[in-house]
From Swiss-Prot:
Residues engaged in binding 4-imidazolone-5-propanoate: 90, 153, 186, 254, 331
Name of protein: Imidazolonepropionase
Taxon lineage: Bacteria, Bacillati, Bacillota, Bacilli, Lactobacillales
Organism for this UniProt entry: Streptococcus pyogenes serotype M6 (strain ATCC BAA-946 / MGAS10394)
Ligand binding (Zn(2+)): 81, 83, 251, 326
Binding annotation for Fe(3+): 81, 83, 251, 326
Annotated family: Belongs to the metallo-dependent hydrolases superfamily. HutI family.
Keywords tagged on the record: Cytoplasm, Histidine metabolism, Hydrolase, Iron, Metal-binding, Zinc
Binding positions (N-formimidoyl-L-glutamate): 153, 328, 330
GO biological process, one term: L-histidine catabolic process to glutamate and formamide
Gene: hutI
Length: 421
């Protein structure tokens, strides 16, 4: 087979044999590091991988040849938890955070999520589209090729749908692949204050059926937390969503452990997100149910909290984990997955291989894209992040710098030395 594109002489390729399930426990520590590696691409797919000189049959008169001495390649990075589409910003809350005002107190004062809800409700489709596109551009320039994007800053049907429509439009227009999550249950809107059950009924009866009918989202999510939605309320919504055919995610155990992990396990959610306050019993329940733990260390960093999710304990117990940005305007205003990956080492005490497995193959399982992306594997899409680094460890050792040299998306050179092509 003659390749369309042949990428050769990488210092290292980060490869693995996808076992057919999210990596857990000791599997997280394993990868195949191919020295002097090459990748052959045809019709947007990886058709060959190896070390040294490529087979002669891969090279034809039209084959594009590029050499990458001194560089490494990983699968395209996957950010599987973002709040991508929103209006406004919340830098005016930063001084309160520095003064130690708790997040839930800011929310109770009309700030936090509800502040962004007001800004998002007043924002036009075009405003939201352009703002979200800029974030996606930034992500792409840092090596991200697939992004999960939640609604949740409307808390009414008109605005929630506008957010989902923006995601759908960007999925068509932008190189990054987007996976849509419906999260109208991100907070209790002011018009339903004191009556969350009534709001959930509106979501179940009036919103979810239309989202499903129009295929606007693949996942449904809820914020199960003190002063937001209880475990029973979360179970009520997610069970109805599951009956309608949605895959499930849940924000759980971020500030307090109030039963969200139990709901995730009972309903076999694909992932439980945050988990800073998870207990040993909660870890065991998620392992038993096969729920992926989606950890968001940049949120803990941004909130200036001391308690990070117990990633080391989770992996050692046999749990599958991912890492994501939680990109949002309040608790985590970043879109930099390289920073998150470095926090995975510095603050969660994970090894570089564990972090890379978390943000590639496990993240692909978290967004139900494991058949297409998440590993440098023959037959998968050629989503490739190429770093200006001599080896895998250097990605984490030399921190706080964008080390991306190039990005390939579906076999097309999409980013080249700081420019989107």
């Amino acid at each position: 087979m003659v390749a369309d594109v042949l990428l050769t002489h990488f210092n290292q390729l980060f490869c693995l044999n996808d076992p057919g399930h999210p990596l857990t426990g000791q599997e997280m520590k394993k990868a195949t590091i191919v020295e002097d590696g090459y990748i052959a691409i045809k019709d947007g797919l990886i058709v060959a991988l190896g070390s040294g000189e490529p087979d002669a049959e891969l090279v034809g008169p039209q084959t594009i040849m590029r050499s990458y001495k001194g560089k490494i390649a990983t699968p395209g990075i996957i950010d599987c938890h973002t709040h991508l589409v929103y209006g406004g910003s919340r830098e005016h809350e930063f001084a309160k955070k520095l003064a130690g005002v708790p997040y839930l107190d800011i929310l109770a004062q009309g700030g936090g999520i509800l502040s962004t809800v007001r800004a998002t409700r007043s924002a036009s489709f075009d405003n939201l589209y352009q703002k979200s596109k800029r974030l996606l551009d930034y992500m792409l320039l840092h090596g991200v090729t697939t992004v999960e994007a939640k609604s949740g800053y409307g808390l009414d049907w008109e605005t929630e749908k506008r957010q989902l429509d923006v995601v759908a439009a960007l999925e068509k227009d932008h190189p990054i692949d987007l996976v849509s999550t419906f999260m109208a249950a991100h907070a209790i809107p002011e018009e339903y204050k004191g009556n969350p059950k009534a709001y959930l009924d509106v979501i179940i009866k009036d919103m979810l059926p239309v989202v499903k009918e129009k295929n606007l989202a693949e996942f449904c999510d809820i914020f199960c937390e003190k002063n937001v939605f209880t475990a029973d309320e979360s179970r009520y919504l997610l069970s109805k969503a599951k009956e309608m055919g949605f895959k499930l995610r849940i924000h759980a155990d971020e500030i307090a452990s109030i039963g969200g992990v139990d709901v995730a396990a009972e309903l076999s959610a694909v992932s439980a997100e945050h988990l800073m306050m998870i207990t040993n019993d909660g870890i065991a329940k998620l392992i038993g149910a096969g729920v992926i733990g989606n950890l968001l260390p940049a949120t803990t960093f941004s909130l200036m909290e001391d308690t990070y999710a117990p990633a080391r304990k989770m992996i050692d117990a046999g749990m599958a984990i991912t890492l994501s940005t939680d990109s949002n305007p309040g608790s985590c205003p970043t879109a930099n997955m390289q920073f998150v990956m470095q926090l995975g080492c510095f603050m969660l005490r994970l090894t570089p291989i564990e972090v890379l497995n978390a943000v590639t193959i496990n993240a692909a399982y978290s967004v139900n894209r494991q058949e297409r992306v998440g590993s440098l594997t023959v037959g998968k899409e050629a989503d490739i992040a190429i770093f200006d680094a001599p080896n895998i460890d250097y990605l984490f050792y030399f921190f706080a710098t964008n080390l991306i040299h190039q990005v390939y998306k579906k076999g097309q050179l999409t980013v080249d030395r700081g420019r989107i092509l």
